[in-house]
């Protein structure tokens, strides 16, 4: 009798475990799209230009000029969506840098899970390397998962992360940051060639596989953006100078999947 009871309990536990995984909890990191419960509630999101009217948009994943060379799933319009909390904080950043002669230029904001799944599929296709010369010339595509350039989840999907740069209102050009958005390499690290604690330019480029470097001016430009973002409640990302997340993000454990389009 005990054997039958224990067998029944085990069966129930297996069913419960399967239900738990189906709801989107993934214990093992694999090179496949993570299963998340599709959350299509965009009620707490705003169109960024409604909050920051003078922001410049260049939504790379709506275009084909990105590391995949394809328009990415889920980007139905070239607009930026963010949680209201993140958009309000970004307005404060905009006011700050505007006083210094700059405008914000946005590459990406909220990113649906279906877009992240698209990245995962692309990274798994080792033959699709059309954009390698422009975004990852020093890397074999097979290492993108291992080195975490591509992952199954993204902070962008929680709605309070933004990729951006500065636009110089005097020159009417992007401020020269010494590297392009979505460059896969150490040259994109915020501390590349400099000390973030002291703000000192060191010129240390030992991590660059090709001995690339950035100038003192380019490092200083990165610091202008970084200081403004940190001053208004955003936290940086250690490997991308353009990537910031609201510290007090309202949905730290929720991954949304509604498309990027006008509300």
Question: PLM features: residue spans?
Answer:
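Sec-dependent N-terminal signal peptides of Gram-positive bacterial secreted proteins and lipoproteins
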Residues: 12-16
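Conserved metal-phosphate-binding beta-hairpin within the catalytic cores
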Residues: 244
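N-terminal Sec-pathway targeting helices
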Residues: 1-11
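Extracytoplasmic cell-surface/polysaccharide-interacting catalytic and binding patches
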Residues: 19-109, 116-239, 249-263
């Amino acid at each position: 009798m005990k054997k039958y009871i224990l067998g029944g309990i085990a069966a129930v536990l297996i069913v419960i475990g399967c239900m738990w995984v189906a709801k989107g909890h993934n214990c093992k990191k694999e090179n496949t799209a993570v299963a998340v419960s599709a959350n299509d509630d965009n009620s707490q999101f705003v169109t960024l230009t409604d909050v920051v009217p003078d922001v410049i948009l260049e939504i790379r994943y709506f275009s084909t000029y990105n590391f995949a060379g394809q328009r990415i799933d889920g980007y139905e319009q070239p607009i930026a969506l963010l949680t209201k909390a993140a958009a309000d904080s970004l307005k404060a950043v905009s006011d700050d840098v505007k006083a210094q002669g700059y405008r914000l230029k946005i590459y990406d904001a909220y990113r649906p899970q279906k877009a992240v799944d698209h990245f995962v599929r692309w990274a798994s296709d080792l033959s699709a390397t059309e954009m390698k010369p422009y975004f990852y010339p020093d890397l074999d595509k097979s290492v993108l998962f291992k080195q975490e350039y591509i992952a199954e989840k993204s902070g962008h999907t929680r709605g309070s992360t933004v990729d951006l740069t500065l636009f110089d209102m005097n020159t009417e050009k992007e401020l020269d940051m010494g590297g392009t958005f979505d460059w896969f390499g150490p040259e994109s690290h915020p501390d590349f060639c400099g000390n973030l604690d002291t703000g000192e330019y060191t010129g240390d480029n030992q991590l660059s596989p090709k001995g690339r470097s950035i100038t003192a001016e380019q490092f200083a430009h990165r610091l202008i953006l970084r200081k403004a973002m940190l001053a208004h409640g955003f936290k940086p990302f250690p490997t991308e100078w353009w990537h910031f997340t609201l510290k007090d993000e309202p949905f730290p454990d929720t991954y949304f999947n509604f498309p990027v389009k006008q509300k």
